[in-house]
């Protein structure tokens, strides 16, 4: 078994399998994040505090949660591919499109984790922080917010990597030859092309397309581009 960061390499497991602490909700009395754990601390015969493996239990102890890791699926999708086509409408108008998709797998959204567990005053919070625990009795999936609080890197920030992206749409119009008159032009086509039009996934602002190891953080997403052009044949 080889553990590397958030993932594990193990015989019989898919590559890029996530190996992380597992959350167990939020304590409605204290607002603390709860975790499943199978490590605890005990005093040995020499009076020394040691970590001991035990039956699974639920705790808000971050140290014990960080030691107790679980398998959470892989970055690998179940299915991925693209769909595209091009065709002509009314003789002179052409239209083409290209889409890509991926179904299954997970990514760890480091930016989401950072905006839900802010370490410094003045940093931005994610909009999901509005669901946070605020008073005893609140039942929510978002723990109390603490600047500089202690949290385990857990499955809370594992997001489905499934997506559907509209990569390109191109619309063109070829002028009838009679419109070209006496110009020494065989054909003239005017077109507009739109790149990276839309992305539909499970987290606004996250782009799972180009990271194959499973970590999404400070990386550039493809820019949306609109271009116009002419195709001339003489």
What are these regions (language model features)?
Residues 1-2, 108-114, 203-208:
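Outer-membrane beta-barrel translocator domains and adjoining extracellular loop/strand segments
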Residues 1-75:
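Conserved small-residue
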Residues 4-32, 129-130, 135-137, 151, ...:
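C-terminal beta-signal and terminal closure region of outer-membrane beta-barrel proteins
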Residues 77-81, 162-167, 222-226:
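Residues that define the transmembrane beta-barrel architecture of outer-membrane proteins
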Residues 83, 95-97, 188-192, 228:
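Transmembrane beta-strands of outer-membrane beta-barrel proteins
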Residues 84-88, 172-176, 231-233:
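Transmembrane beta-barrel domains of outer membrane proteins
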Residues 92-95, 178-179:
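Repeated loop/turn-to-beta-strand initiation elements of outer-membrane beta-barrel proteins
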Residues 102-190, 194:
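Extracytoplasmic gating/loop element in the C-terminal half of outer-membrane beta-barrel translocons
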């Amino acid at each position: 078994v080889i553990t590397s960061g958030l993932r594990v390499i193990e015989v019989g497991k898919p590559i890029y399998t996530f190996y992380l602490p597992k959350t167990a909700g939020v304590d409605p009395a204290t607002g603390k994040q709860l975790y499943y754990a199978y490590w605890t601390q005990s005093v040995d015969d020499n009076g020394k505090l040691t970590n001991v493996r035990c039956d699974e239990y639920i705790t808000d102890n971050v140290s014990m949660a960080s030691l107790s890791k679980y398998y959470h699926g892989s970055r690998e999708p179940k299915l991925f591919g693209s769909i595209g086509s091009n065709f002509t409408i009314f003789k002179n108008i052409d239209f083409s499109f290209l889409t890509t998709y991926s179904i299954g797998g997970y990514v760890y959204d480091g930016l989401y984790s950072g905006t839900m567990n802010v370490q410094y005053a003045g940093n931005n919070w994610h909009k999901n922080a509005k669901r946070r625990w605020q008073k005893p009795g609140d039942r929510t999936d978002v723990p109390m917010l603490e600047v500089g609080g202690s949290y385990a890197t857990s499955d809370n920030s594992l997001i489905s990597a499934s997506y559907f992206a509209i990569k390109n749409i191109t619309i063109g119009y070829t002028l009838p030859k009679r419109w070209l008159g006496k110009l020494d032009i065989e054909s003239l086509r005017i077109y507009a092309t739109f790149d990276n039009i839309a992305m539909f996934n499970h987290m606004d602002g996250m782009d799972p397309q180009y990271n194959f190891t499973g970590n999404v953080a400070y990386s550039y997403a493809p820019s949306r581009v609109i271009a116009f052009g002419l195709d001339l044949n003489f």
